[in-house]
Curated annotation (Swiss-Prot):
DNA-binding region: 1-69
Name of the protein in its database record: SRY-related protein MG42
BP terms from Gene Ontology: brain development; camera-type eye morphogenesis; negative regulation of transcription by RNA polymerase II; neuron differentiation
PROSITE patterns named among the record's database cross-references: HMG_BOX_2
Molecular-function annotations in GO: DNA-binding transcription activator activity, RNA polymerase II-specific; RNA polymerase II cis-regulatory region sequence-specific DNA binding
Localization per record: Nucleus
Keywords: DNA-binding, Nucleus
InterPro entries: HMG_box_dom, HMG_box_dom_sf, SRY-related_HMG-box_TF-like
Source organism of this protein record: Tarentola mauritanica (Common wall gecko)
Gene3D superfamilies tied to this protein: High mobility group box domain (1.10.30.10)
GO cellular component: nucleus
Length: 72
């Protein structure tokens, strides 16, 4: 069972697609590096929708998997 997405992951889904459309051969690690800085530069108020969605996903995950325990 996968962990629920955090706010950065929710935001980066769409942004990652945009980068992959422009540079389809770019490695995932490089894409992640390119996504990190813009996320850091977002104002807290701009992050609110992604934080809320991550919270909703976390609650749903807890309901779907009540005995889930993260084990890397």
């Amino acid at each position: 069972v996968k962990r629920p997405m955090n706010a950065f992951m929710v935001w980066s889904q769409n942004e990652r697609r945009k980068i992959m459309d422009q540079w389809p051969d770019m490695h995932n690690a490089e894409i992640s590096k390119r996504l990190g800085r813009p996320w850091q530069l977002l104002q807290d108020s701009e992050k609110i929708p992604f934080v809320k969605e991550a919270g909703r996903l976390r609650v749903k995950h807890m309901a779907d998997y009540p005995n889930y325990k993260y084990r890397p």
